[in-house]
Amino acid sequence: HAQFFRGLAEAAGLDEEQQQELRELLANKNYFGVEEMVEGMHLNDTLKKLFSLLGSFETQVEELAEAKSLASDYPNILSAITDLEKLGSFLRLYGIEKYVSFELGIISNYHYYTGIIFSGYTFGSGEPIVKGGRYDKLLTYYGKTSASIGFAIVIDQLMAALSRQKINITIETN
């Protein structure tokens, strides 16, 4: 969730350069680097613990309870966790929650995301075949105000996954 990252950055008082460094560490899954960076920041224990959750991979929405209790004094972080809990409730209603995991450290190089950011994987694929997220302000660049959600299918990864799964698609031509 983009707001989780932004809320942490705001609460820690990170400048733009520090935020970029943290983004790069997270993008490279360098959680030791994140820990080292956080140790040098002189943060309170609660914020340190929240930063440590950037490397967590929760398989059930209930596992976000620890993050929620820690975030009680940080409204932006709490709002992000609440959004994820709501998503978890919808997933449960449709019986598909077992197919979704929550990763608090997922970020995007696209800074326009304001909400949930997602990646989709399939069997035999270590790379996402779909990526996307919510952006509330992107369309203002084009003179329109509207919340939106979008995604992209990564064709190369999708084709590789189909090949690994030995799924052949017949293309009809007229």
Describe every region a protein language model picked out:
Residues Q3-L14, Q18, G33-N174:
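Positively charged, Gly/Ser-enriched RNA/tRNA-binding surfaces
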